[in-house]
């Protein structure tokens, strides 16, 4: 069995049929085989294939179908009397083709207009429809529905109101490719797209005229029913048989003859005829079909107008598959067509292969700088190391909200998003407006590639700052989500012609082609699936006669900006001069690259994030000290960067390639709190916006007690306590009026209340459980305000929404300075200050006094200092303060600061510090010990490492240090050495410390910390011993200038300078926090139908449905087993007095009296006159059982018997009516997750999240500025005299070693004031000033633009169960549910009426004694059962909440009456419940009816006695064993019996109150007494 046909093969076969007249396989029989006559075909050579449904469905041979003669055409078949169906294998032995045309000539009947029915349907082997054509009489439309490839249904709807005018119509449905079209009376009604569908399998049945709901045949008349295997044959069909006058002989009967061969007229309109596009099939070159296709096209061309003479409006050229096969000359290109309507969205193409690596940086010419392209965005990096901690600067006040910025220009289209999940099954929306009809042709030839457009106009935005050169591209980021399609933009200018490409591969078939008005020759099809990427093309041949390329179409509007990608891995910048050999053993740390050239000014950006802080406002009132937050979680170390790739050269010219870094990744994980130096005092910010609503204040003073409310309704009774002490004997109860005779020991109705008794002793039971809360009383007036209460514990609820802005408050008083707060976040960089006033020129200081001693010997190496705080800021960069750490994970119950925590993890090194001041020369130490032999080779590597990590620390070329084994002679002056270990190497150690700590574990001993900063000069050493007098030295050269004096004390803080001019624009800030979610986007276009989801888990039980319809009576159940006696229940509550019941049944017969003594035997007297009937004699002894007598006649209906014993569960009855709503059940267990629902509407914007933690440290900064010059060396020794009087100018000498300090000179005169100095660098941060006063609240700013849509938040925790909702209005009647499970066996029916009196039986044997205890127990149980039912009835009338909240509060005020709820939607039928467990044994039933009469006994031996007087009735016999008879009809009301004599005196009653359960059964349920004022019922 062929399950699917390739559309290409199918079309191929069709063309083969048309060209050669061959049969299309064996799937479609020929018209000769089927008896099909295409009388109106204009092409006799066309071979018609298809199926004659009238023949294949045996309609002519079915006797139930009425045949009516038709003088104008074929017989009329009146369907509807019998189902029209046949197995699919008989109708379509090899299945139905993918493309076909269904032709039906029908007349619909009026009584079918109320139904929805299938005109044509093919089902599968399981009875599910594979394809169906449904008539929707309500909407006057046809719906074609077929099974899609993913198992769901694909469908399209055609409005056809003309079918319902009670006249004959020819209906033609053609399915070709992805398009379905409907023609009514040879006029196109509509064409609709049809999704991909499965092929029709021959496993099921074919139906004509089937009711969709009841499955019955539908009545309509039929003349013609057949299927063509070529969907185009509907154009060859004529409609003469349904036209009133038929067709004139000279008129063409085919619509195709009236049109061009390739143009299809769809519908006459006011502006003229509308034609669809010409279609040509494209097949592979040199295939066998080309000749056939060309042959057929040439035949058609011969039948139409010659096309080589130019094409008119009604003509189309034949399809030229290549220039070699056709000599067609095309005319000049037409005018530019108007903007076409937007086509239907094509299905998404297959995912393209990964593209080749793109070029990175290109050198256009040898002298030009590198032009670099931004690399792809990297993935999100891991958390960076902890940033350098800094002390917080004083926080300025919040600035005023800036003015709303101008709206940015529309952004460029976003990157394509990831493929969405398959959509859920969508319900077909409301019927759309009638679209323009049109057939879809085969796919057109691939167009020539258009010329590239000119570059667009430059953007309007300000020029961006020059970008830093980037590193290698990061790994490919995840695919962003799809942006919303933007509107179409204006068309670009025509571009210069590009290199033409070769012909691309064949594309997929096109979708529905919208029809265009006449004269529009620039036809454009709907977009198909994106084809695979074509190979680079060769130059296209310039054939003569081809038209010029049309103008480029309008450009669409850009889409909404795409989602931000994840953060890439950090990479160092690469410069063009860095090779791989410079990176050393530490991969991934590149040196800073050269600054890139300024980019072309970009377009104006979207609205920016929050602006920088304004000028600092006046200091605010000090806030209360906040608790010190716990240290944040240490972030994971980021992965090292890949080494910079070597520069690659391209072959096409002198181009060099350098990677630039990708865009910045997202903000990393928060770092720990920093501990850096305090920042400078920021300027006061502008007045801030009104803050969010503050936390709730402390509770107020408790109010005075309010007025006592009205008493609430009494609660439900508590659990019964233990029995109290026995009371005194009460008065006897009166007998219940409804019980007579032997039942007098049952308690009677309650009497009037007696006098109030003395209070009894206190009970000894436990207190009962609290009763249900009473209904709230009437709300009392509010009490006076109470006194100030104690502050409550901190709340634990979620943060509430921001309240409305309050009115502006008065400024508060100056508070006391608070304690130092936790480190604050770094403030924004302030504006450039204006230069301060020029200071006065100070006097020249006097030279220092003192005699310079001889140089001391070098001292020994001091002990290693304590590890100081590492701070390695990059030279020339400010020291940044760290952001405060993220809030701790746990909130304590107290808001007091906790104890001192353990020391935090050492922070990462900061950037290199600023150069220190010139230190004071130290004293020479003692001579050192000879050094050990150094390992050559390690130091250069270490130096290289340090250089790569810390920057160029040496400020010049470094010399390898000399490795001394023993003291040698003094060498020449060396080049300045590498800076000490304490600045650069400690940075390296600090960076490597976390790895070492991870490898070492938590409990191992820590490594020594970084070396501290240079210490202050130590105290002067003790004077050394006087040395031997040396020889007098030569007069030395003048000494160098003395050392710089010690740093003076810090001066007083200067006056605040004037406000400076605005500084240059700062660098772009970090990305701001994510804005609130945006407004809901524009509703997207409908997606393709997604695959059906897997069957979901069973959902939670649905709410109780509405009452169903009355079900039929169930069959009579079998008799159930006798239940055991239940235990005696607790004493019930005092009930209301019941109504007097109806008269009770006659009492049981009295006990048989003792037989009297036998009298003397009398002689037989003469037969006297028949006397009157004597009194009944005493009962004789029971006789032996008699022989089974014949069955008596059916007796009259007896009276209702007593209830029988509980029978066995009967078979399941039909579903009964739905009962009233039951009590609210307890909250069920959480259900299993249901299937994914439809996408909901976007929710409201969420509340602002907590501030994010500090970001990870940035990449290494650029190389710092050169350091200050070194110290002057000592003067060298004089050289020998020169050869001549004047020597040549020598090279500049190497600076000599530093000389000893010269003798102090005489104090000089004060010098002239020097020129004013350059403005000094920023001084150290000043002390924290006192906080300013609280500023006034500013007015609320204007409403900001809606932010972009926020990311989807994580699923919240499961909320607590809500309060039960009020009952909704009753919904409409739901559909009838499936048959329920078997019900329990019904109770036995009521006994039938009493039969006719039978023949008197023989006296029975002595019966058992009547057990009155059983009778009393039974009556008591019945009464208790009635009481329970009455209690349940009253309880259901009370509107108490069935569940009490877990933490009950005080009763609230009474709520207002709620408005009646809207009717709820009808619930879906519930699933059949599980079969219940076997019930407990029921109560014993009432005594059974007397058994049937026994068989007649054998005739006894003895002398026949005389006829005695009729004996009294015998005692009750044992129960019989006959089967229960059928329920008899209701008997008539019997005559009231004679009142019996009063019974004997009953036994004394039990002590205590009357048990209401003994009397309650007499109260009818339907009536109610008004409550007595002196009594209270169960609910007061």
UniProtKB/Swiss-Prot annotation:
Region (Nonhelical region 10 (NC10)): 232-374
Bias (Low complexity): 585-598, 698-714, 801-817, 1098-1107, 1247-1263, 1396-1405
Region called Nonhelical region 4 (NC4), residue ranges: 934-967
Function: Involved in mediating cell attachment and inducing integrin-mediated cellular reactions, such as cell spreading and alterations in cell morphology.
Region (Triple-helical region 1 (COL1) with 2 imperfections): 1449-1554
Similarity comment: Belongs to the fibril-associated collagens with interrupted helices (FACIT) family.
Organism: Mus musculus
Region entry Nonhelical region 8 (NC8), spans: 571-586
Domain Laminin G-like, first and last residues per copy: 50-231
Ranges for region Nonhelical region 2 (NC2): 1410-1448
Ranges for region Triple-helical region 4 (COL4) with 2 imperfections: 882-933
Tissue-specific expression: Expressed in most tissues examined with highest levels of expression observed in heart. Strongly expressed in cortical and medullar regions of kidney and more weakly expressed in lung. Also detected in the ciliary muscle of the eye, on the serosa layer lining the muscularis externa of intestinal tissue, and in the perimysium membrane lining both the cardiac muscle bundle and the smooth muscle tissue of the small intestine. Strongly stained in particulate or granular structures. Not detected in brain or skeletal muscle.
Species classification: Eukaryota, Metazoa, Chordata, Craniata, Vertebrata
UniProt region (Disordered), positions on chain: 324-547, 585-935, 995-1405, 1445-1523
Region of interest: Triple-helical region 7 (COL7) with 1 imperfection: 587-640
Stretches for region Triple-helical region 3 (COL3): 968-982
Molecular functions (GO terms): integrin binding
SUPFAM superfamilies assigned to the protein according to its UniProt record, in alphabetical order: Concanavalin A-like lectins/glucanases
Listed GO biological process terms: cell adhesion; cell adhesion mediated by integrin; cellular response to amino acid stimulus; integrin activation; positive regulation of focal adhesion assembly
Subcellular location: Secreted, Extracellular space, Extracellular matrix
Name this protein carries in UniProt: Collagen alpha-1(XVI) chain
Gene: Col16a1
Record region (Nonhelical region 7 (NC7)): 641-661
Region Nonhelical region 6 (NC6), annotated ranges: 733-747
Superkingdom of origin: Eukaryota
Segments of this protein annotated with the region Triple-helical region 2 (COL2) with 2 imperfections: 1006-1409
Region (Triple-helical region 6 (COL6) with 1 imperfection): 662-732
Annotated segments matching region Triple-helical region 9 (COL9) with 3 imperfections: 375-509
Entries under InterPro entries matching the protein: Collagen, Collagen_superfamily, ConA-like_dom_sf, TSPN-like_N
